[in-house]
Amino acid sequence: MQLFTHIYQLKLIPPTGIVNKITNKKGKEIDAGSKTARNFLIKMIDNKTEIEVSYHAKRTVTSGTQIGLSFEQISNMVKGAVGVDGNTLGFGMTFLHELHHTTIGGDYHDSTELFGTGPVVDNMNIIRNELNKQGFNYGERLNYKAIHTKEGNIIPFNESALTSLKYNSSMGKKAHYIKTK
């Protein structure tokens, strides 16, 4: 959990498994990280339904109460970040994204349109925007699908990248995106 502290502002107390909000010396909750992510994660932890998480999937996929995370796929997205923090589609954010697909997370579905976001990406963009306001660079995901181009499969994180994709042109210097395999 330490790896994702800047996103959630929660700490796990081993070996009890108790999750607490991070507080200052006076016991007041620190208003940092994403409040939306923190509240969503607490809601998931408080739910009695267990979610099974696997880290050995070939591709990241979710069904019902099972999440399969692909170490290779997520690592490639982190490495493929251009103009945004690689963690914008890193392990913490991908885990939160996939939780939205579970039965306890809303059972939301991703957009099937060539260009569009859908409810999961929209919820994740709220989290990204809360982090961006604190000086992080998570961008705003403007399309769910990675669009195949001659440069690779591209997920746009600003208008410059989205426009380049819509007009089938090369990514410009101002484009923020994640290139995937």
Region locations from a protein language model:
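Active-site scaffold of zinc-dependent metalloenzymes
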Residues: 45-92, 102-106
